[in-house]
From Swiss-Prot:
Localization per Swiss-Prot or TrEMBL: Cytoplasm
A Pfam short name: tRNA-synt_1c
Family: Belongs to the class-I aminoacyl-tRNA synthetase family. Glutamate--tRNA ligase type 1 subfamily.
Superkingdom classification of source: Bacteria
Protein source organism: Mesoplasma florum (strain ATCC 33453 / NBRC 100688 / NCTC 11704 / L1)
Subunit structure: Monomer.
Organism lineage: Bacteria, Bacillati, Mycoplasmatota, Mollicutes, Entomoplasmatales
Protein name, entry field: Glutamate--tRNA ligase
EC main group: ligase
Gene assigned in the entry: gltX
Amino acid sequence: MTKFRLRYAPSPTGFLHIGNTRTALMNYLFAKHYNGDFIVRIEDTDLERNVEGAIESQFENLNWLGINADESFLKPGEEKYGKYMQSQKFGRYQELAEKLISIKKAYRCFCTTEELEKDYEDQVAKGIVATKYSGKCSRLSESEIESNLKSNKDFSIRFLVPETTLNIKDFIKGEITFDSKELGDFVILKTNKIATYNFAVVVDDFDMEISHVLRGEEHISNTPRQILIYQAFGWETPQFGHMSLIVDSTGKKLSKRSGNALFFIEQYKNQGYLPEAMFNYISLLGWSPIGEKELLTKQELISMFDDKRFSKSPSTFDMTKMKWINSQYMKALSEEEYLEFTKKYINTEMFNTKEKSEDWLNQVLLLFKKELEFADQINNHLNIFFNEVDVTSETIEILKTIEEHESVIKEFETQISTLNEWEIENIKSLIKLVSENTGKKGKDLFMPIRIASSSSEHGPSLADVIYLLGKDKVLANIAKVK
């Protein structure tokens, strides 16, 4: 059987985001499931739009996610596969475009930009919606072509589209039919001698012996042009599969303008998401394994991958689900792993950790291990431990709704003031004693104590919070609500 070789081919015109991560990840799973090769190729022919640092960012974030390339320009494969950056293959594209001219599958187009615009405007005026090239230069005589060349007239190279019906067997969408009459003769080499996307991608996929092309459905319209190029050269066509769109909560295509969803992988990295959780969630966008299990390791996903289980319907990016999956991975970390990871995200300008002991800081951080959705959220919980916090008017109003809260706070203050051995078990016993002495329990007991001791109505284990705040800070906080 032919070896499975799949590729992810980003353009360095932007940074790694959810959409192209899904493409890379699915190609990776597909290749690894069949013990094949996963290739990362750079499509950098759009020189004016290339963004500095984008290539480095792509590789850095792919590696962070665990989507590791078997081949790339950093790790080339066999010499026969050619270069892994399109900007290093201009000669190859030009040579093959000229070959198509020699076998009458392409021709030089000498039309100027102004002539083309006029032609398209005339078509629109006639009510033609899907405008296309008229084919004017395909009818030039040899002498006319020679004359234009001698005059050094600029030309592009256009593919001569044959009249045919293409039946494409898409392994996700099923059979798709195209009438080539709708395409028009398209440019494969621009006047600046740079190959267009549809031509370069076919040459690259052929050179690299790509067996399957798995990509987003926005590329479906490119597929007939690419297949025609394969056929013109007499090359074997890879299998094509087009994944459904990823949409946001409003049903629009996910983009950097989508409301509550982060778009770029770097944003998730900076907020303290775990790469394993990101890998897990993104793998479930438009694809599903057999069974109900949602938390899956990379190795499990490789083993379970099935190219017949892609969805034909759009997949909604659910930020709540993303956070939930990450929280499960956070909970699964060992205490040592959790502490090492979370400390990287503490805002040290807001919270002076150097003034505190390592043991105390560890205990504070561990209070929130089961509560964090992502590591940066730790900063939402540290204020009461590091800084002076005023009790909000909203919190005071909550306190007022609890009958006889004053007596609970007074008794709590009395017991705290006389507590000599500051230990968690002693604090638990103290709270129990306050309950016995006031006859209060449940919310009527714990809410006044929590607000009085921590200036907040929310938090983890009450005794742990009181212990870590320390006696002096607790007494100072009580004074704020008396």
